[in-house]
Amino acid sequence: MGKKIAMILGSPDPDSFCRALADRYAESAEQAGNEVRYFRLGEIEFDPVLRHGYNQRQELEPGLKDIQEAFTWSEHVVVVFPVWWGSMPAIMKGMFDRVFLPGYAFKYRENSQFWDKLLAGRSAHVITTMDTPPWYFRLVYRSPAHNQIRRTILEFVGIKPVEMTVLGPVRYASAAKRQTWLDRMSAFARKA
């Protein structure tokens, strides 16, 4: 029996290489018997700004409610995004700000510095692309995008283990290299 996979594409560009990677992963995962709920953030209408922080409730748009329901339903989460300026695209950060709310994804304990991780019991695979050589991003920049998504977002709410796949530099990648990366998506999806 397959897994229940919630999948987020964080690139707003419908013609991006991230889109091709995510499409291949979703298609291969379904062919392998998994159930996939796949969200392309660039196609979902929502305000990515958490207007009042956690001080005032901001109603979730239908697309964000669907994403929240998919996280609840899922056993495995797949997130695909390009690294822009050392981080994730703003639309993806906005989605996490709006969806991973207190009481849903985490809950602060009264009179404590600690919190309950309300999305525990799920694993994740984060797939990123970049034009920077991955070794340079890791050694010189210290992987800020990867630390953010793994430690301060997914693990903060209990999603672990988090597997990371870093592809790059994309800008100079040959057609053969890109095909190799697409084939890796199929292999990852089959073993999800």
Over which residues does each language-model region extend?
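Glycine-rich phosphate/pyrophosphate-binding loop and the adjoining helix
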Residues: 136-192
